[in-house]
């Protein structure tokens, strides 16, 4: 019998492979995206120091309304505003092994519109 592939395990494998080649520095930190069934989370991370510089998610009080894609747009806007407030303008986008489509793309576009370059 053919077993059905576990999509999340495949995504995690893809993410590990990409993370081997992608790293954030203090000059150009990594914008990491995690997508769950109910929410979306974004962090700006300096991998050299191992520190999260800015973050936003659907758990924030400002984000609770709208569809998941609309929430992703608000999260992208919030994380960009918080990063720009800390003097970060350029980041490396880490899509977390997800396809660049839907909620991930909406978050990335909103972050670009609000001052992050990647």
UniProtKB/Swiss-Prot annotation:
Instruction: List GO terms (cellular component aspect).
Output: cytosolic large ribosomal subunit
- What's the short name of a Pfam family annotated to this entry? Ribosomal_L18p
Q: Mind listing the GO biological process terms from this record? A: translation
Residue span of the signal peptide, if any? none
Task: Return the similarity comment.
Answer: Belongs to the universal ribosomal protein uL18 family.
Q: What organism does the record attribute this protein to?
A: Streptococcus pyogenes serotype M1
Point to the regions of Basic residues compositional bias.
Answer: 10-20
What function does this protein fulfil? This is one of the proteins that bind and probably mediate the attachment of the 5S RNA into the large ribosomal subunit, where it forms part of the central protuberance.
The protein's name is Large ribosomal subunit protein uL18
Identify the CDD domains for this entry: Ribosomal_L18_L5e
Spell out the Gene3D superfamilies in the cross-references: 3.30.420.100
- Transmembrane helix in keyword set: no
Q: Which Gene Ontology molecular-function terms are recorded?
A: 5S rRNA binding; structural constituent of ribosome
What are the disulphide bonds in this sequence? none
Determine the domain of life of the protein's source. Bacteria
Region annotation (Disordered) maps to 1-25
The record, for HAMAP family, names: Ribosomal_uL18_B
Q: What is said about its interaction partners and assembly? A: Part of the 50S ribosomal subunit; part of the 5S rRNA/L5/L18/L25 subcomplex. Contacts the 5S and 23S rRNAs.
What InterPro entries does the database record attribute to this sequence? Ribosomal_uL18_bac-type, Ribosomal_uL18_bac/euk
Keywords, sorted A to Z: Ribonucleoprotein, Ribosomal protein, RNA-binding, rRNA-binding
The question of whether Ion transport is a record keyword is answered with: no
């Amino acid at each position: 019998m053919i077993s059905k592939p576990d999509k999340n395990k495949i995504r995690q494998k893809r993410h590990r492979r990409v993370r081997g080649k992608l790293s954030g520095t203090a000059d150009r930190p990594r914008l990491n995206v995690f997508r769950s069934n109910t929410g979306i989370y974004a962090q700006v991370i300096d991998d050299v120091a191992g520190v999260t510089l800015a973050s936003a998610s659907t758990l924030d009080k400002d984000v609770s309304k709208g569809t998941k894609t609309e929430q992703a747009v608000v999260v992208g806007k919030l994380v960009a505003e918080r990063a720009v407030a800390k003097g970060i303008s350029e980041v490396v986008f880490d899509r977390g092994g997800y396809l660049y489509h839907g909620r991930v793309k909406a978050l990335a576009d909103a972050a670009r519109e609000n001052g992050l370059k990647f």
